[in-house]
């Protein structure tokens, strides 16, 4: 039986057809390293009866299931950017109501050629989530509390993505936008891995 990383590579290569084997190895082994997950099985499956099992998706660095995707996304994005956006820094904009923010900050911290900015509603996250985000280490991480709710944060991020003047100014300065929210395919494809792996 293949370990989780082996299953991840086999599944991801079906979707990421423009990634080489070495690139997939780099992404998967970097994302799911033992120092980031509390179980070497990454997403252990425990049988509790003949018909029921429990899949643990909380073994990552922030104890949120979103770590499963947000540990891999920075690697996928970096490899993709090296092919298509040479000499460009990727600015990751994220709207969160809690878990996504911390998991994205943790995933992207200190990743070369990236900057991440997380927007969260000032009264819309728990005190623990706020503390996790506002104390995040990393030389490329920032958080911004907004007045309003999650929908307001998300609308603000979308308006930045669609503002042609902002995009033009960023492009002139060798900057490009991306997202760590679930609109990004790189957030979704890692989820396929743990569903298939559990099966």
Q: Model-found features: residue ranges?
A:
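PLP-dependent amino-acid enzyme catalytic core
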Residues: 1-199
